[in-house]
Amino acid sequence: MSTKPTIAFTHLGCEKNRIDTEHIIGLLVQAGYEVDANEELADYVVVNTCSFIQAAREESVKTLVELAEANKKIVIAGCMAQHFPEELLAELPEAIALVGTGDYHKIVDVMQRVEKGDRVKEVTAEPTYIADETTPRYRTTSEGVAYVRIAEGCDYRCAFCIIPHLRGKARSRTIESIVVEAQKLADQGVKEIILISQITTNYGIDIYGQPKLADLLEALGKVDIPWIRMHYAYPTGLTPKVITAIQDTPNILPYLDLPLQHSHPEILRAMNRPWQGQVNDDIIKRIKTAMPNAVLRTSFIVGFPGETEEHHSHLVEFVKRHEFDHVGVFTFSPEEGTPAYNLPNQLPQEVMDARRQEIMEVQQSISWQQNQKLVGQLVDVLIEQENPQTGELIGRSPRFSPEVDGLIYVKGEARLGCIVPVMITDADIYDLYGCLISSAA
């Protein structure tokens, strides 16, 4: 019987944080620690926090306070530990350790020191670490899906973004390392991997001297995983070579997540993305011409300091004109330590909320129309869940990425983690409904 303490985990934030959590769990399990989903039964709770914007920090703080009030011993990991180490130690006596974004591979040593009674701060000022295929990992996603981090950190300095401070400079894994990990996941039965980094299209610059995303996609084309999806493709990095690699590699989904942030050149200049304003329309046109079946997701920030009604109207028309498949809209969050924090002409929250709502309503109409086109079509669906009450299956098609896009509700019988043909019979703004064509899956 194990004499090691039991540890529970709470994960907050993005899928990059999720991968960090999975490595933390993997390392602790390898070292003999017990992991329990029940925080009440655990000796320690590791909270992997998010600090990207104010709302994320508030969620992280709420979670930490609730655990502190329950007298839990807390290990704070992730972006808040990186961002506010001294404040957290001062204000939360229950925090017995802090682990920064570049230090989670030291978690076993941290826990051993904690067990001896130490209060530990393991936070490297500028993170440089990136896990690879040799780092233990315990996946927390559904059995058919896995995220694969191809790079970490960011060298861009967008005026609104705190990520370079939280995650460090850009650093990539080798193509060989990523392919080995993908093959391991294929051997485990994974059907979809999602490639992530801060800027996926900049992959490889630091180790190869030039972007190597196209070469990576071609190499991953030899791995037996049916769906490979990319997130965070910076628009100017979608070169003809990358687009050709997507076209020519059958298991690379024509799904592009483009964090455009805005459409108006003046706002993009203020955001320190000056080159983007002149190319947004051209890049989208090039993608749609080369890949008429491409699924486009993007995200925008409304209410950036100085954004006028004219700037906002430009963005609304941009959304109408391009008819994106999926859109996320965020109100500007002033982040201390970023250039945008002290910019003049900050907008009231109610103005930002109204602008966000307007774009969301425009996009909802577009999304509804896009989904209606799929009624009567046969699509491949990766089955991920089963509703225990109704027996209804829940999954996604290539046009839906996990967490951020819609779902497909399926009538029929199939194994979890397999891809099956589904006839779409109905659709709403975000989700699709259908019937399994064959129950032989």
From Swiss-Prot:
<dbReference type="Pfam" id="PF04055">
    <property type="entry name" value="Radical_SAM"/>
</dbReference>
<keyword id="KW-0808">Transferase</keyword>
<dbReference type="InterPro" id="IPR006638">
    <property type="entry name" value="Elp3/MiaA/NifB-like_rSAM"/>
</dbReference>
<dbReference type="InterPro" id="IPR002792">
    <property type="entry name" value="TRAM_dom"/>
</dbReference>
<dbReference type="InterPro" id="IPR020612">
    <property type="entry name" value="Methylthiotransferase_CS"/>
</dbReference>
<feature type="binding site">
    <location>
        <position position="158"/>
    </location>
    <ligand>
        <name>[4Fe-4S] cluster 2</name>
    </ligand>
</feature>
<feature type="binding site">
    <location>
        <position position="161"/>
    </location>
    <ligand>
        <name>[4Fe-4S] cluster 2</name>
    </ligand>
</feature>
<dbReference type="InterPro" id="IPR012340">
    <property type="entry name" value="NA-bd_OB-fold"/>
</dbReference>
<dbReference type="GO" id="GO:0005829">
    <property type="term" value="C:cytosol"/>
</dbReference>
<keyword id="KW-0411">Iron-sulfur</keyword>
<feature type="binding site">
    <location>
        <position position="50"/>
    </location>
    <ligand>
        <name>[4Fe-4S] cluster 1</name>
    </ligand>
</feature>
<dbReference type="GO" id="GO:0051539">
    <property type="term" value="F:4 iron, 4 sulfur cluster binding"/>
</dbReference>
<comment type="function">
    <text>Catalyzes the methylthiolation of an aspartic acid residue of ribosomal protein uS12.</text>
</comment>
<comment type="similarity">
    <text>Belongs to the methylthiotransferase family. RimO subfamily.</text>
</comment>
<feature type="domain" description="MTTase N-terminal">
    <location>
        <begin position="5"/>
        <end position="116"/>
    </location>
</feature>
<dbReference type="InterPro" id="IPR007197">
    <property type="entry name" value="rSAM"/>
</dbReference>
<keyword id="KW-0949">S-adenosyl-L-methionine</keyword>
<keyword id="KW-0004">4Fe-4S</keyword>
<keyword id="KW-0963">Cytoplasm</keyword>
<feature type="binding site">
    <location>
        <position position="154"/>
    </location>
    <ligand>
        <name>[4Fe-4S] cluster 2</name>
    </ligand>
</feature>
<dbReference type="InterPro" id="IPR005839">
    <property type="entry name" value="Methylthiotransferase"/>
</dbReference>
<feature type="domain" description="TRAM">
    <location>
        <begin position="372"/>
        <end position="438"/>
    </location>
</feature>
<dbReference type="Pfam" id="PF00919">
    <property type="entry name" value="UPF0004"/>
</dbReference>
<dbReference type="InterPro" id="IPR013848">
    <property type="entry name" value="Methylthiotransferase_N"/>
</dbReference>
<dbReference type="InterPro" id="IPR038135">
    <property type="entry name" value="Methylthiotransferase_N_sf"/>
</dbReference>
<keyword id="KW-0479">Metal-binding</keyword>
<feature type="domain" description="Radical SAM core">
    <location>
        <begin position="140"/>
        <end position="370"/>
    </location>
</feature>
<feature type="binding site">
    <location>
        <position position="79"/>
    </location>
    <ligand>
        <name>[4Fe-4S] cluster 1</name>
    </ligand>
</feature>
<keyword id="KW-0408">Iron</keyword>
<dbReference type="InterPro" id="IPR023404">
    <property type="entry name" value="rSAM_horseshoe"/>
</dbReference>
<dbReference type="Pfam" id="PF18693">
    <property type="entry name" value="TRAM_2"/>
</dbReference>
<feature type="binding site">
    <location>
        <position position="14"/>
    </location>
    <ligand>
        <name>[4Fe-4S] cluster 1</name>
    </ligand>
</feature>
<dbReference type="InterPro" id="IPR005840">
    <property type="entry name" value="Ribosomal_uS12_MeSTrfase_RimO"/>
</dbReference>
<dbReference type="GO" id="GO:0103039">
    <property type="term" value="F:protein methylthiotransferase activity"/>
</dbReference>
<dbReference type="GO" id="GO:0046872">
    <property type="term" value="F:metal ion binding"/>
</dbReference>
<dbReference type="GO" id="GO:0035599">
    <property type="term" value="F:aspartic acid methylthiotransferase activity"/>
</dbReference>
<protein>
    <recommendedName>
        <fullName>Ribosomal protein uS12 methylthiotransferase RimO</fullName>
        <ecNumber>2.8.4.4</ecNumber>
    </recommendedName>
</protein>
<dbReference type="GO" id="GO:0006400">
    <property type="term" value="P:tRNA modification"/>
</dbReference>
